Amino acid sequence: MITLKQALSLSQDELETLKNEIDAKVRASDLNAYIKAPSLNGASAKGVPILIKDNISVKGWEVTCSSKILEGYVAPYHASVIENLHQNSMAGFGLSNMDEFAMGSTTESSCYGITKNPRDKNRVPGGSSGGSAAAVAGGLAVAALGSDTGGSIRQPASYCGCVGLKPTYGRVSRYGLIAYCSSFDQIGPITQNVEDASILFDAISGHDNKDSTSANLKPTQTFKNLNRDKRFKIAILRDHIKDASNEVQLAYENTLKALKEMGHEIVEKKMLDSHYQISIYYIISMAEASSNLARFDGVRYGRRAQNIKDLKELYLKSRSEGFGDEVKRRIMLGNFVLSSGYYDAYYLKAQQMRLIIKEQYNKIFEEVDLIFTPVAPTSAHLFNYHASPLEMYLSDIYTIGANLSGLPALSLPVAKDPLGLPIGMQFIAKAFDEQSLLDVSYALEQELDLKLD
């Protein structure tokens, strides 16, 4: 597939040809990365075609978060990131499959069916932005937008062999993103390489008056300032990699060796055990989800239950029929931790621990420029691999820290396991220092020159 950098130099006629080629590929593909062929969404704006995750509003398109409960909901306005794309010669072209309401790590909970990993169709693409990552890796998209609540851009990028960037919280507007956990959610790019990630990130970043959490900063210029010659002081968290598979640990050590040979300084640091972070993350995210998803009741928009007797039954049936099992589980657990008698014991304590985690990251970043970790404990696993929801939640063990602390993080493919499946590693930077993330990743990408095909 042509890169985003290359596509931006095409004429309008050439872009129309490219869109037709992508549409034909999607129709012929069995990956199920797109919800439907892009042409079925209606006419798209002029510009380089960018795949959009199915929780980002595109005016006139049916946007469902891959859930039955939003069946038939047509977005009445553009998300701010879509308007930003239009201002930078890009446009939405198709919606990608995802875990329902972004609650999952495998893209198996979508009402549209599973998405397959293009590297091995018997394996998951990761999630929740699995459709976006599978499309980019499978040659079905120039680039894509995803959302990241606890690793939902970075983990599928690692599983599929793409570059995935979660910007600093507040760097990219969330206006028009259908919320899962408002204090963690962030929109970001999934691309074929670091240059493309930089270009797409620059296009969607910047202050937005329509988002009260948007940082009052100008759009970034990371692509213009990309520098592969900078050297950084990089922290590693040895205690945190003990849960990784042997293949991931080997890739981690080999990448560390490459970073040292490139002239970067590596230092060891310690912080709160990552298993505590998992508990904190899920308590807060489920609590916010139970509140955010209360609006989907069958009254104002989306799916409405039929043959009901009264308002109570309308609510009950619409939500029971419309939400999948994982979403119901998180809503119930979220309501539990917010309930009387448990609020202080769970939710309040989790928020207090979140502040401690932020302080620990800030303390580390007083001495270093970046933190280096794996993205996931394993490479992509087979479908129906997890024996329980708790096992699935543990797959986020390396990514949630950046969401808890609002920091930027980037997933870069660095190796292949014995089966040829990609393995990604993650850099985390100080707040609003995406430039360092992209610089070190750009240099490492050039150094490793990993061939996945």
Curated annotation (Swiss-Prot):
EC numbers, comma separated: 6.3.5.7
GO BP of this protein: translation
- Catalytic site residues? K53 (charge relay system), S128 (charge relay system), S152 (acyl-ester intermediate)
Q: Which UniProt keywords apply?
A: ATP-binding, Ligase, Nucleotide-binding, Protein biosynthesis
For this UniProt entry, the molecular function terms from Gene Ontology, in alphabetical order, are: ATP binding; glutaminyl-tRNA synthase (glutamine-hydrolyzing) activity
Question: In the UniProt record, does the keyword Nucleotide-binding occur?
Answer: yes
Pfam families given for it?
Answer: Amidase (PF01425)
A GO CC term attached to the entry: glutamyl-tRNA(Gln) amidotransferase complex
Superkingdom assignment: Bacteria
Q: Which Gene3D superfamilies match?
A: Amidase signature (AS) domain
**Catalysed reactions listed for this entry:** L-glutamyl-tRNA(Gln) + L-glutamine + ATP + H2O = L-glutaminyl-tRNA(Gln) + L-glutamate + ADP + phosphate + H(+)
User: Record keywords: Ligase included?
Assistant: yes
What's the stated role of this polypeptide?
Allows the formation of correctly charged Gln-tRNA(Gln) through the transamidation of misacylated Glu-tRNA(Gln) in organisms which lack glutaminyl-tRNA synthetase. The reaction takes place in the presence of glutamine and ATP through an activated gamma-phospho-Glu-tRNA(Gln).
As for family, the record states:
Belongs to the amidase family. GatA subfamily.
Quaternary structure note: Heterotrimer of A, B and C subunits.
This chain belongs to the protein called Glutamyl-tRNA(Gln) amidotransferase subunit A
**Species of origin:** Helicobacter pylori (strain HPAG1)
